[in-house]
Amino acid sequence: MARKSLIQRERKRQKLEQKYHLIRRSSKKEISEVPSLSDKWEIHGKLQSPPRNSAPTRLHRRCFSTGRPRANYRDFGLSGHILREMFNACLLPGATRSSW
């Protein structure tokens, strides 16, 4: 189980990313449309003004039940450990274990 503070920090990053998403997207679009290099540098400086934690690359996918940041399956939103436990308990319909 992940510490509560780490999960809260991740939620804070998600909120910041949603808040500054439009600003980042519009700045990137402006950079691609402006032909002069000096204007591009100006817009690039504006792109660096939002908080660092508002960048989408700072986000991690976390397990829905445990908060584990690694080995997550996107389709289920769970870590591999919990996913295997749910497979074994037949809690995920349509999922079968491999056997050969």
Swiss-Prot record:
GO MF term (any one): structural constituent of ribosome
GO cellular component: chloroplast; small ribosomal subunit
A GO biological process held by the record: translation
Alphabetical keyword list: Chloroplast, Plastid, Ribonucleoprotein, Ribosomal protein, RNA-binding, rRNA-binding
InterPro entries in the cross-refs: Ribosomal_uS14, Ribosomal_uS14_bac/plastid, Ribosomal_uS14_CS
Localisation: Plastid, Chloroplast
SUPFAM superfamilies the record matches: Glucocorticoid receptor-like (DNA-binding domain)
Broad class of where this protein is predominantly found: plastid
Subunit structure: Part of the 30S ribosomal subunit.
UniProt function note: Binds 16S rRNA, required for the assembly of 30S particles.
HAMAP family given in the database record: Ribosomal_uS14_1
Family membership noted in the UniProt record: Belongs to the universal ribosomal protein uS14 family.
PANTHER family given in the database record: 30S RIBOSOMAL PROTEIN S14 (PTHR19836), SMALL RIBOSOMAL SUBUNIT PROTEIN US14M (PTHR19836:SF19)
Annotated protein name in UniProt: Small ribosomal subunit protein uS14c
Gene source species: Ceratophyllum demersum (Rigid hornwort)
Upper lineage: Eukaryota, Viridiplantae, Streptophyta, Embryophyta, Tracheophyta
Gene, per the UniProt record: rps14
